Amino acid sequence: IVGGSLGSRTLNNCLMGGLDYFKEQKIQVIWQTGTLMFDACKQAAKGYDNVKVFDFISNIDHAYAAADVIVSRAGAIAISELCLVGKPVILVPFPAAAEDHQTKNAMALVEGNAAIHISDKHAQEQLIPAALQLLNDENKRTTLSNNIKAFAIEDAAERIVDEVFKLIPGVN
């Protein structure tokens, strides 16, 4: 569960309310809370040996590699990382993002059957059941995983550098 570098009140509140469900099904959770809610989330997870709580995960690639399902906001950087990782994803876009770009990002993947979208408004009721359902549906996880990989642009950094150099006079 990743709510971006600052965390997500919505995702944190959903998870705090759903810890028992994950424990019952023996599901391990890696939870990045952000700094603002870290103490409250850490306290809520006390006694849940299946839940590892971090304010920030520096080596997010390791957390992604360990995950069977990823729950995330839908910012551009997160989306690009998730496409490269190729894991099944549930996206809960931040509704106050400029021009609602996170919802647009999420819907591009949803339309390609590459992610599941849950609105921030409905996350409290829908997120935990959707995560549990996806964790228990290997076929759906495989489909989402295969489809999200098609959105990955592995040489994005090189493409950006090439475009920048085109703008600099005298640089080929």
Segment roles from a protein language model:
Residues 153-172:
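C-terminal alpha-helical cap of glycosyltransferases
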Residues 72, 88-99:
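Short hydrophobic beta-strand element within catalytic cores of glycosyltransferases
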Residues 1-72, 102-106, 111, 116-127:
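Donor-nucleotide binding loops and adjacent catalytic segments primarily
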Residues 5-7, 36, 94-97, 149-150:
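Short histidine/acidic/glycine/proline-rich micro-motifs that form metal-
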Residues 123-136, 165:
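Two-component system phosphotransfer/interaction surface
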Residues 140-154:
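A short, well-ordered alpha-helix in the C-terminal region of glycosyltransferases
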Residues 61, 79-87, 107:
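Short alpha-helical segment that forms part of, or immediately flanks, the ligand-binding pocket
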Residues 65-79, 87-88:
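Acidic donor-binding loop of glycosyltransferase active sites
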